[in-house]
Amino acid sequence: MAIPANEIDLARYLEHSLLHPAATEAQVKECCEAAVQFDFPAVCLYPTAIKTARDFLHQRPIQICSVVGFPAGAHTTATKLYEAQEAVENGATELDVMLNLAFVKMGESEKLYQEVAQIVELTKVPIKGILETALLTDTEKRLAAEICLDAGVSYLKTSTGWFGGTTVADVKLLYGITKGRIGIKAAGGIKTVDQAIALIQAGATRLGTSRSIKIMQEREQVSDNPTW
């Protein structure tokens, strides 16, 4: 049964993302400050920003997520392993790992499994496997999701946002596969309260967005005059 909209604490779902390639150190600090202000569970950043976030968020209960193989996933396994390990050493407490979609398209299930499982085993931190759902058929989404489950990921992430946004249909599909065993991070094009609520009601447990502040401001504005 879907969570009633007026009972959803939006802030605890929002993973505040700063994945613009030209983001400055000052903007990284602003991202982290917003996470503190709104009590977001995590920030999601490029590997080069992890040390800055670690120092800024020192001893605060906010997860620091680094992307790996982002945004295309077309890196060698050795490169992804190095990038993942370095990110953790620099302070990342979670990793969003872009899958090698060619493995999915070619049905190379064992190669995909081995890559993801090695990252899970090496880093010992929660891994979110990014499916890039806009580029996959439903059959391919199911295959990738099941391989990620077997490999030990903690979340499935719908999208990077670079090749198309997340949809309620995709979240429902992934939730039907996972059945609550792991989390689902919806990401890509989430800009409004209505979008956020619909995705949560579909089964998302995290929402990755650069619009977290605007969403919270919108929620505060409409809270006195709810339309749900």
UniProtKB/Swiss-Prot annotation:
Keywords: Cytoplasm, Lyase, Schiff base. Its main location: cytoplasm. The keyword Cytoplasm applies. The active site is at residues 96, 157, 185. It comes from the Bacteria. Pathway: Carbohydrate degradation; 2-deoxy-D-ribose 1-phosphate degradation; D-glyceraldehyde 3-phosphate and acetaldehyde from 2-deoxy-alpha-D-ribose 1-phosphate: step 2/2. Pfam families: DeoC. It is found in: Cytoplasm. InterPro entries: Aldolase_TIM (IPR013785), DeoC (IPR011343), DeoC/FbaB/LacD_aldolase (IPR002915), DeoC_typeI (IPR028581). SUPFAM superfamilies: Aldolase. Its EC number is 4.1.2.4. GO terms for molecular function: deoxyribose-phosphate aldolase activity. It catalyses: 2-deoxy-D-ribose 5-phosphate = D-glyceraldehyde 3-phosphate + acetaldehyde. GO terms for cellular component: cytoplasm. GO terms for biological process: 2-deoxyribose 1-phosphate catabolic process; carbohydrate catabolic process; deoxyribonucleotide catabolic process. Catalyzes a reversible aldol reaction between acetaldehyde and D-glyceraldehyde 3-phosphate to generate 2-deoxy-D-ribose 5-phosphate. Belongs to the DeoC/FbaB aldolase family. DeoC type 1 subfamily. This is Deoxyribose-phosphate aldolase. The gene is deoC.
